[in-house]
Regions:
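N-terminal secretory signal peptides that target proteins for export/translocation
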Residues: 1-3
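Bacterial N-terminal signal peptides
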Residues: 6-15
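Feature marking well-ordered beta-strand scaffolds used for ligand recognition
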Residues: 18-329
């Protein structure tokens, strides 16, 4: 077979493969205009929780098609929450960590005068990103909250994820990795500085390897690899056309505030610019493949894989409320 004939066959094969490849699509399937500013999303089984700042928090049943949410506003300015198997622990701007019963009643609080920005629960321990107080660990039992320990940070602790025996903290100044195997004596295990503002993070594990995506405000997104000891190493970055030197909380434009993995895709809640989708199949070169404008302020994003291989994307869109999309990558 001649070279030219083989070349034609290869082109025909590639054309056929492209013709049968499902195009990338991001389609909105649900919108709910909350009474406050939708700030963060949490998923727990068939329950979808929205931290709605001035509107308290909302709980939707996913199986019912998100109809008739339970709206609870016992706390002022809910920034984030941990579902905690139907007993939510709220991170409140003014009231600290707040324990809520399944019926919506407040059963306990922990406050130290700073702002609780994010919380995750493991067993009877709540781990909080607590502003200038850094990482705060609280024991929750019988509806009460008691301080166990803390680890101050040099920046403003804004978000965290628990991964194995470590807490990964977005500390504005950078990513802090904390060994929490002894909750009474948390110890810093690693740190990676940010060129702008490290606001939020998302962790993806595969084959024993951990890849962390960082939302870094005007520095866009960063991809970071963690080794077993928790030492972070920067793999790549995409600035999304932003400038690290620009001021925080801009009145317009982008400022990456949250990220969420969806397979090898990464979703970035990019402030007034809406939702960005990046293809990270080549982790050394993440590239933007879609941008969806927002009528609000894109603040928090979570994803969930569906049986057909698509993803549901849940966006806390500030003054525009909750938006849900289906993504086919």
């Amino acid at each position: 077979m001649g070279i030219s004939v083989r070349f034609v066959i290869i082109l025909q094969f590639l054309a056929c493969a492209c013709a049968h490849r499902q195009p990338t699509e991001l389609r909105e399937i649900f919108h709910f205009d909350t009474s406050g500013w939708a700030h963060d999303i949490a998923l727990d089984g068939d329950s979808l929780y929205v931290a709605d700042r001035q509107g308290g928090f909302l709980a939707f049943n996913i199986a019912s098609g998100y109809k008739a949410p339970r709206i609870a506003a016992p706390v002022r300015d809910v920034i984030s929450l941990s579902p905690n198997s139907g007993r939510p622990v709220l991170a409140s701007r003014f009231e600290g960590l707040v324990l809520v019963s399944p019926s919506g009643e407040i059963t306990g609080r922990y406050s130290n005068g700073d702002i609780a920005n994010a919380v995750e629960v493991r067993g009877d321990l709540a781990f909080a990103a607590y502003g200038l107080q850094g990482l705060v660990i609280v024991r929750i039992a019988d509806g009460h909250a008691r301080l166990v320990s803390g680890l101050p940070t040099t920046g403003w602790s804004h978000d965290l994820r628990l991964s194995h025996g470590q807490a990964l903290v977005a500390d504005w100044n950078g990513l802090k990795v904390v060994d929490i195997r002894d909750p009474e004596k948390p110890v810093q295990a690693g740190f990676l500085p940010s060129p702008a503002t490290c606001i939020s993070l998302s962790v993806q594990e595969s084959g024993g390897s951990r890849m962390v995506a960082l939302a870094e405000g005007h520095a866009g997104i960063a991809l970071v690899r963690l080794n077993a000891e928790g030492h972070p190493s920067l793999i790549s970055r995409n600035y999304l056309g932003l400038k690290p030197s620009d001021p925080i909380h801009p009145g317009s434009g982008g400022w990456v505030h949250s990220v969420a993995w969806a397979g090898h895709y990464l979703f970035a809640a990019n402030w007034k610019r809406g939702l960005a989708v990046l293809d990270c199949a080549e982790v050394e070169n993440p590239r933007v493949i879609l941008e969806l404008p927002s009528s609000g302020t894109a603040l928090g994003v979570k994803t969930r894989r569906q049986p057909d291989g698509s993803y549901l994307v849940f966006l806390a869109d500030g003054e525009s409320g909750l938006r849900i999309f289906r993504f086919n990558g």
